[in-house]
Amino acid sequence: MQNFSFVWNQYDLVRGMFLARMTEITEEEADVVPDGFTNNIRWNIGHILLTQDYLLLGPEGMKCPPYYAAMFAPGTKPADWQKEGPSLEALAAELKEQHVRIKEELQSRLNDPLPKPFELGDKGTMHTYGEMMVFTLFHEGMHTGCISSLRTAIAAAK
């Protein structure tokens, strides 16, 4: 059996860094959509949560509230929300719970094939849970960068 401890170490690192950054964000700041952006910080956080559940566990295994798809799926934006977004505290708690749950559910399955390969057009295809896990870490890092850009734009507009 292959040793995937490095993947779990990276997951711990990435999620830990993300949760630490979340403590610097206020509820007010989380809802600002600066000029030139379509989403806010709260959307990016919810999107990370929803996407990781969906990509690793599929629609049947997701633990996010059902209404999160209408709020945080690709192509959605806060301007279209029909209800108030979850608090940062709630999102942080869900991210912590997800971290534990995914490690428990996939600990010994990273070499297992996904039910169906996940294709990113001509950019590549994920075939295993391990490949998808690594992709979700890239995705989380990408949205961490988006949040940094949003915070910079918010600070510049003050």
Q: What positions do the PLM features span?
A:
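Generic serine detector
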Residues: S5, G16, S87, S108, ...
